[in-house]
């Protein structure tokens, strides 16, 4: 569903919000600090000179390392928090090999009690107060970013830390896109923003500047859709702040790739796999549709991904035995569909097998790989309340909530559905935005939203090629101006080249 900040229904939703709450082991690449000093006359002198020089080099690196604060953009779900803890240990282990001065390594989901910590900007004032006097850089990374500490220090050492720097691997739009509100429509390539998977850095002077601005001009209550783009826009300040400076050493190549030799950072996971994929019979798929789309959208589902699903039902406002569809007794609405979604949740809990641990709700114009979803779900515990998909936010600068955007698919563990329906949180109207109401409900229940960048609310061409290049995507959304069957078989169909360990395959994807 499209999002237009400022629409009356969003204001109504925010105004009504208070009513509802009544109701792999890591692979650490070896490194060495090697110095070949001048003046070594023979091999007997060399070890002594090396030891002295190396000691001084390590001491300098140790001091510089202490001036970097590492922020892992982690999540509280057990699968993600463990991966973040593993990365933290890896960073500290590398640092320990260089001397006694260890850097600060923080997990973002542990840093702040409020919902919006993952959006970064609300934390800038805390960063400034705590680290503004004794640090030089804040370095952000994802849980699957792999860091070569010595190379990172060498890379950051090229930049004057007393100036304002915004560093990262540059992404850009090749055409204006809805997820960026069609910004820079005349020349979308002119504006760049960081690929979080490669890591990105802010110098402390820039952090202090942002903190000062946020103190005088608090963040507006608005939507968070694509955080990396929105952070870059905020820093740029319509030309008053710095652009992103591209850093070639910030990479998203696989750690074992020949391309990674020059990299300070690499990326380790294109599609997680934690044991055997979940069984087809363990995933129940619910497709939301209506009579007017039975003739054009449902045939696309049947030509593409329906065959991957063992358990699938189509929910409509009209019972059509040729599909077949199930009439839930909920009239169709032009937008929102909250009533229909809650009816689906009730049906899953009361009419499906109690042994089916996972529910997926998709739109009739969602393109999804159930094959890849089953692999992904192998990493999540169905005995935990899991609500998984592409995460958006509403009003997070002022105490709002996160939600899973519906077009890319919403994944629920059975226990999450049980906890939701046991609460009193329900739709305030039948046409309320279902994904936002669900986000608000789960927030009130203390059940975190779990984000996966492999789900997509929009079409492939709405995302930078560089961003998609290190993904094996699970879903896309919308049939607008595309051949959806072609998109499915290009981007989502099970591919014989997909390796068993989830590494990136050599796809032959034409521009769509």
Model-assigned labels for residue ranges:
Residues 2-512:
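Secretory-pathway lumenal glyco-enzymes, predominantly type II signal-anchor Golgi glycosyltransferases
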């Amino acid at each position: 569903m499209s999002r237009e900040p400022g629409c009356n229904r969003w204001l109504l939703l925010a105004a009504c919000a208070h009513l509802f709450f009544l109701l792999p082991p890591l692979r650490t690449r070896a490194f060495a600090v090697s110095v070949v000093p001048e003046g070594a006359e023979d091999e007997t002198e060399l070890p002594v000179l090396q030891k002295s020089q190396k000691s001084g080099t390590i001491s300098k690196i140790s001091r510089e390392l202490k001036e970097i604060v590492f922020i892992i953009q982690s999540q509280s779900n057990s699968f993600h928090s463990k991966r973040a803890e593993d990365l933290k240990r890896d960073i500290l282990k590398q640092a320990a090999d260089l001397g006694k001065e260890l850097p600060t390594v923080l997990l973002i989901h542990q840093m702040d009690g409020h919902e919006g910590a993952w959006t970064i900007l609300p934390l800038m004032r805390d960063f400034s107060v705590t680290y503004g006097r004794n640090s030089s850089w804040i370095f952000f990374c994802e849980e699957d970013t792999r860091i070569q500490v010595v190379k990172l220090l060498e890379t950051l050492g090229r930049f004057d830390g007393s100036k304002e720097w915004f560093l990262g691997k540059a992404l850009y739009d090749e055409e204006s896109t809805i997820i960026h509100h069609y910004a820079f429509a005349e020349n979308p390539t002119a504006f760049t923003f960081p690929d979080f998977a490669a890591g990105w850095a802010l110098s402390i002077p820039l952090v202090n500047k942002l903190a000062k601005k946020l103190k005088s001009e608090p963040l507006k209550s608005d939507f968070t859709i694509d955080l990396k783009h929105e952070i870059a826009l905020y820093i740029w300040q319509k030309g008053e702040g710095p652009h992103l400076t591209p850093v070639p050493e910030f990479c998203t190549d696989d750690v074992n790739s020949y391309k990674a030799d020059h990299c300070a950072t690499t990326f380790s996971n294109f599609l997680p796999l934690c044991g055997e994929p979940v069984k087809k019979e363990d995933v129940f798929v619910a497709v939301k549709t209506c009579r007017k789309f039975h003739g054009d959208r449902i045939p696309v589902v049947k030509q593409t991904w329906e065959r991957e699903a063992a358990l699938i039902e189509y929910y409509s406002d009209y019972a059509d035995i040729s599909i077949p569809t199930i009439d839930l007794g909920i009239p169709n609405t032009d937008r929102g569909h909250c009533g229909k979604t809650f009816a689906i949740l009730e049906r899953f809990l009361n009419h499906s097998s109690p042994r089916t641990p996972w529910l997926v709700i998709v739109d009739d114009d969602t393109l999804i790989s159930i094959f890849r979803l089953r692999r992904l779900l192998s990493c999540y515990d169905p005995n935990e309340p899991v609500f998984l998909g592409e995460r958006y936010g509403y009003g997070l600068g002022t105490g709002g909530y996160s939600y899973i955007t519906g077009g890319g698919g919403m994944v629920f563990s059975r226990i999450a559905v049980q906890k939701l329906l046991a609460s009193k949180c329900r739709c305030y109207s039948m046409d309320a935005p279902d994904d936002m109401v669900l986000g608000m409900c789960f927030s009130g229940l203390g059940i975190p939203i779990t984000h996966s960048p492999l789900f997509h609310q929009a079409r492939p061409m709405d995302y930078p090629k560089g961003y998609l290049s290190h993904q094996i995507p699970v879903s896309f959304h919308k049939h607008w101006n595309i051949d959806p069957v072609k998109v499915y078989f290009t981007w989502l169909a099970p591919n014989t080249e997909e390796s068993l360990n989830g590494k990136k395959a050599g796809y032959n994807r034409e521009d769509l």
